[in-house]
């Protein structure tokens, strides 16, 4: 089971980093969890890149090994308080995207698998540090998607109507 979970997380990371680099995926269409992750994590990543632009402009990542070291140091600090939630898990993917974009463009061009190497250490960190929490909180399909998938207007309308009826019933 752990191996299949790691493969699933690795696939999510790989698809996300392909999305960041705008590398066309030649496989089947991404899963719903993958699409939601791309939308949410990329939004977080853009916000981080905008807010920390002056810092990131002077921030250099010379190699995949350097990216791995920086990633592990930052994530260790981020999770030292032991608090895990879906928002923090999304930031792991987003930070992987930031680091990948900071690699020298020549290296990414020469090493077309750079995103695969980054996705490996992102997936390993997620599995080793948040895997149990993910399982306990519904997994990617029942936990993550429900947390971040926007509700349709019709569904929201029905929920609001139900709440209004509940309030009217309580007022009687």
UniProtKB/Swiss-Prot annotation:
<dbReference type="InterPro" id="IPR046371">
    <property type="entry name" value="Bcl-2_BH1-3"/>
</dbReference>
<dbReference type="GO" id="GO:0001783">
    <property type="term" value="P:B cell apoptotic process"/>
</dbReference>
<dbReference type="InterPro" id="IPR013282">
    <property type="entry name" value="Bcl2A1"/>
</dbReference>
<dbReference type="InterPro" id="IPR026298">
    <property type="entry name" value="Bcl-2_fam"/>
</dbReference>
<dbReference type="InterPro" id="IPR020726">
    <property type="entry name" value="Bcl2_BH2_motif_CS"/>
</dbReference>
<keyword id="KW-0963">Cytoplasm</keyword>
<dbReference type="InterPro" id="IPR002475">
    <property type="entry name" value="Bcl2-like"/>
</dbReference>
<feature type="short sequence motif" description="BH1">
    <location>
        <begin position="77"/>
        <end position="97"/>
    </location>
</feature>
<protein>
    <recommendedName>
        <fullName>Bcl-2-related protein A1</fullName>
    </recommendedName>
</protein>
<dbReference type="GO" id="GO:0002903">
    <property type="term" value="P:negative regulation of B cell apoptotic process"/>
</dbReference>
<comment type="function">
    <text>Retards apoptosis induced by IL-3 deprivation. May function in the response of hemopoietic cells to external signals and in maintaining endothelial survival during infection. Can inhibit apoptosis induced by serum starvation in the mammary epithelial cell line HC11.</text>
</comment>
<dbReference type="InterPro" id="IPR036834">
    <property type="entry name" value="Bcl-2-like_sf"/>
</dbReference>
<keyword id="KW-0053">Apoptosis</keyword>
<dbReference type="GO" id="GO:0005737">
    <property type="term" value="C:cytoplasm"/>
</dbReference>
<dbReference type="GO" id="GO:0001782">
    <property type="term" value="P:B cell homeostasis"/>
</dbReference>
<feature type="short sequence motif" description="BH2">
    <location>
        <begin position="132"/>
        <end position="147"/>
    </location>
</feature>
<comment type="similarity">
    <text>Belongs to the Bcl-2 family.</text>
</comment>
<dbReference type="InterPro" id="IPR020717">
    <property type="entry name" value="Bcl2_BH1_motif_CS"/>
</dbReference>
<dbReference type="Pfam" id="PF00452">
    <property type="entry name" value="Bcl-2"/>
</dbReference>
<comment type="subunit">
    <text>Interacts directly with BCL2L11/BIM and PMAIP1. Interacts directly with BAK1, BID, BMF and BBC3. Interacts with BOP. Interacts with isoform 3, isoform 4 and isoform 5 of ING4. Interacts with UBQLN4.</text>
</comment>
<dbReference type="GO" id="GO:0043066">
    <property type="term" value="P:negative regulation of apoptotic process"/>
</dbReference>
């Amino acid at each position: 089971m752990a191996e299949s979970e790691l493969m699933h997380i690795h696939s999510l990371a790989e698809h996300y980093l392909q999305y960041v680099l705008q590398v066309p995926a030649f496989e089947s269409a991404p899963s719903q969890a993958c699409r939601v992750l791309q939308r949410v994590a990329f939004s977080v990543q853009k916000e981080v890149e905008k807010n920390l632009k002056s810092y990131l402009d002077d921030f250099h990542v010379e190699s995949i090994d350097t990216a791995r070291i920086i990633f592990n140091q930052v994530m260790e600090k981020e999770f030292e308080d032991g608090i895990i939630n879906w928002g923090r898990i999304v930031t792991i993917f987003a930070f992987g995207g930031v680091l990948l974009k900071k690699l020298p463009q020549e290296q990414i061009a020469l090493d077309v698998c750079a995103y695969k190497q980054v996705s490996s250490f992102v997936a390993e960190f997620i599995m080793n540090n948040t895997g149990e929490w993910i399982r306990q909180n519904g997994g990617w399909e029942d936990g993550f998607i429900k947390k971040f998938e926007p509700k349709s207007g019709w569904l929201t309308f029905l929920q609001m109507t139900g709440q209004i009826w509940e309030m009217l019933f309580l007022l009687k």
